[in-house]
Amino acid sequence: MKFFAVAALFVASAMAGPMGSEGCPGGLTGTVPLCCATNVLNIADLDCSTPTIPVPNVGIFQAHCASKGKQPVCCTLPVAGQGLLCNKPTGAQ
């Protein structure tokens, strides 16, 4: 019974999550847009900062990060200037 309640809560939160946020795809992972300098084994990204302007699409997101000398990434969890579990946004070069 507890499993069903936890599973239902998980599904409900996934459905309530954003369906695309500032150049990053929606869903449970990779929803936080960051501009990062270094990628370590696609697990952690270092020297990250949050975009200072709205980045509604990948082109603007990529150009904004490039102006800082960084790469655009969509992360699951930003921690102390690092991004964890990050991916390139769909369509980024």
Swiss-Prot record:
Residues spanning the signal sequence: 1-16
GO cellular component, as recorded: extracellular region
UniProt keyword list: Cell membrane, Disulfide bond, Membrane, Signal
SS bond list: 24-74, 35-65, 36-48, 75-86
Gene3D superfamilies with a match to the protein in the record: Hydrophobin (3.20.120.10)
Domain of life: Eukaryota
InterPro entries linked to this entry: Cerato-ulmin_hydrophobin (IPR010636), Hydrophobin_sf (IPR036686)
Listed Pfam families: Hydrophobin_2
Main location: membrane
Subcellular localization: Cell membrane
Subunit details: Interacts with maize ubiquilin 1-like (UBL) protein. Homotetramer. Further self-assembles to form highly ordered films at water-air interfaces through intermolecular interactions.
Family statement drawn from the similarity comment of this UniProt entry: Belongs to the cerato-ulmin hydrophobin family.
PANTHER family reported in the protein's UniProt record: HYDROPHOBIN (PTHR42341:SF1)
Annotated function: Aerial growth, conidiation, and dispersal of filamentous fungi in the environment rely upon a capability of their secreting small amphipathic proteins called hydrophobins (HPBs) with low sequence identity. Class I can self-assemble into an outermost layer of rodlet bundles on aerial cell surfaces, conferring cellular hydrophobicity that supports fungal growth, development and dispersal; whereas Class II form highly ordered films at water-air interfaces through intermolecular interactions but contribute nothing to the rodlet structure.
Full protein name: Class II hydrophobin 1
Organism: Trichoderma harzianum (Hypocrea lixii)
Taxonomic lineage from the root: Eukaryota, Fungi, Dikarya, Ascomycota, Pezizomycotina
